[in-house]
Amino acid sequence: ALDLALKTKDEIPENRFAWTVEALDPFYSWWNSASEDRRESMLDMIENKQIGINAMPFHIHPYANKEQWDEMFDWIPKDMWSQLDIEVGMQHDVNGFPRAAATRLLDRDIHYIWTGINPHWGGSPVEQPGAFWWKMPDDRKLLVWSGYPYWQGYLFFAEKEWRLQQREYANTQTSWPRNGNILQTDDVSMHGAYDVCVKRLKDLREKGYDYPFLTLTFTNEWRCDNDGPMPQLLAFIKKWNEMGFKPMLRMKTAGEAM
């Protein structure tokens, strides 16, 4: 993700690669092993709004106790935190986000939560996708985006998953999609993707969705879960906009989208 961001940093904003680090803990592991040059490059891309980082170390079940929540919000050194410009707390796939977490986000001056409930294991108390203000007992509040789970983004441009499997052998016996396998940018494929998108958006409108925008999370189609970035996505977005399709597409971090 860092290399893709660096490669496109001098492009116009809509043609830059963007990536949201889904959990703070693996980022901390990367940071501890990275060279000083790589750390500086990462901070440059964070400043350039091409990389954003989740305030939460993991996607966490809702039953942690007070001591555990305190530890999770003191996960990295304070001087490191101050450099990362963290704007949002994310909770995807693991359902349940308690007030204990929300108040600690506010204590860190973070006012956004991005969620994607797994519909196989629960349901949303509000219509998805959509936003609402979550007010705390002390009158502080956060803006919550209750979005689709991360595998849904691809399905706004394709009839079905390219591959959806989570198997122990995935790392060694399958490969991530290569150029030409997925999100093809020839005219026929682009028009097909446009037709799928228009149908999905029409369905949303008929169900009452009235926002003038839609934000989607987008995962790779290698293992779907915990995947790396998909380089083909940026070329697809660029071609889409060049063809004049509406709505226009933008690749943004979660913080920028909020």
Task: For the regions a language model picked out, list residue spans one by one.
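Catalytic-domain carbohydrate-binding cleft regions of carbohydrate-active enzymes
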Residues: 1-258
